[in-house]
Amino acid sequence: MNILFVLSSVPHTSPWSTQVAMVMITCNLLAIVAGRYAIKVRGLGPSIPVSGVEGFGLPELLATTSLGHVIGAASILGLSNVGLIS
């Protein structure tokens, strides 16, 4: 495949800024909150050293933040293409 064709089809993305960081943080927090209540089998792996999150360990944290990053990247690309993030 011609690399120039691939490069020409990549959309313009906004550079890293405070707006981009806030969108990513918000998406990750929403995914963690949703995962806290949606994950049925919890606490099978090692726990994280944070008080008040009994039963929400490292595997759950990695899973929810992975989902949060996927949602955040899609949100940033979408908001960038619409023009709401510069």
From Swiss-Prot:
One of its GO terms (cellular component) is chloroplast thylakoid membrane. Belongs to the PsaG/PsaK family. Disulfide bonds: none annotated. It comes from the Eukaryota. Keywords: Chloroplast, Membrane, Photosynthesis, Photosystem I, Plastid, Thylakoid, Transmembrane, Transmembrane helix. The lineage of its organism: Eukaryota, Rhodophyta, Bangiophyceae, Bangiales, Bangiaceae. It is found in: Plastid, Chloroplast thylakoid membrane. The chain crosses the membrane at residues 15-34. InterPro entries: PSI_centre_PsaK_sf, PSI_PsaG/PsaK, PSI_PsaK, PSI_PsaK_bact. The keyword Cytoplasm does not apply. GO terms for biological process: photosynthesis. The gene is psaK. This is Photosystem I reaction center subunit PsaK. It is a single-pass membrane protein. The keyword Ubl conjugation does not apply. SUPFAM superfamilies: Photosystem I reaction center subunit X, PsaK.
